[in-house]
Amino acid sequence: MISNNTITIILVIAIVAIVFYIYFQRNKSRKDSHKNPGNYQNFGTLNNSSDAKIMKKSVKKSTKKKSTKKLLKKSNQNNQQNNQQNNQQNNQQKKVRFDKTVKYNIYKQQSPEISSHNSNNSPFDVDTILNSIYSDQSDISEDSNCSELSEMSELSEESNHSELSDTNNNLCCNIIPSNLEDNTNNYWDSSFGLPLATDEEKNKFAKQIKKNHKNYEKALGNFTKHKTDDNVIIKTDTTIEMFKSPYTSDEDETELQRKPRTVKDIYDNKVAGPKAKPKKIKYKTANMVMYENENEMNGGFIKGTNIHGFDGNAGFKSADICDEF
């Protein structure tokens, strides 16, 4: 049988567990209500509907206040950013000042004779001709008007051609500024804001350019010497020098004139070994042939023996001193 003490202990533990369970459930419901104020299902634990309505209204008011505060902060930040951008744009705007006293170099491809002639004594004035035509319309017919106009145009063309032919040759030399006086060296160049260079400044500039060019040539020469240093290039017996003639005597040069050699011929001449001299028969016997100037390297007898040396043309097995000795 279970004693009374154990029963009381179990009851106390159960009561404490129920109290803790209720406490934690209420804390959870409060946290959920703060996180999700729009979700009103968490208020189902409340018994009275009036309490739930009051809680809903309070949550709505708090959310409205928070949203209005956020909107006010955002609007203030946007206004500050716009003001800063406007200030920067106003500071960065270029302020241009126009000076009416500045004389700009506007050149005309005309000589002064042509310009004065066209302005004052033009040979073909349209206004005067039209006034003369329309003044007496009853007396002058259309045919006569056309004839007079054609005659005047022909005269004007002839005069223009005669005058232009004399001045076309001098157009390149007579480029005259329209708004400047004769002595333009005393004025500032309005397009760049710098005075025109004097003769002394031009000479200094030319000397500086020459000096810089000499320094450039020296630097370039040192660079080429460094790149083509003979100590870097390893020369052997078979090295081909492209800029050196492969012929050493005048006879070789005459051969070059008769028959030019290719790069392959030069390479073969450098790489190939010594050519064997043609063999001359000294005497023949029934068993062998003896040649002049025989030695062991061209198929003759080895000194002090009756053994043939390596011929150089046949394989190694033909030599008596090799595998088949």
From Swiss-Prot:
Residues 55-73 have a biased composition (Basic residues). Its main location: host cell. GO terms for cellular component: host cell membrane; membrane; virion component. Residues 68-97 form a coiled coil. Glycans are attached at N27, N47, N48, N145, N160, N222. Residues 36-51 have a biased composition (Polar residues). Residues 30-95, 138-166 are annotated as: Disordered. It is a single-pass membrane protein. Residues 74-93 have a biased composition (Low complexity). Keywords: Coiled coil, Glycoprotein, Host membrane, Membrane, Transmembrane, Transmembrane helix, Virion. It is found in: Host membrane; Virion. The chain crosses the membrane at residues 4-24. This is Uncharacterized protein L309.
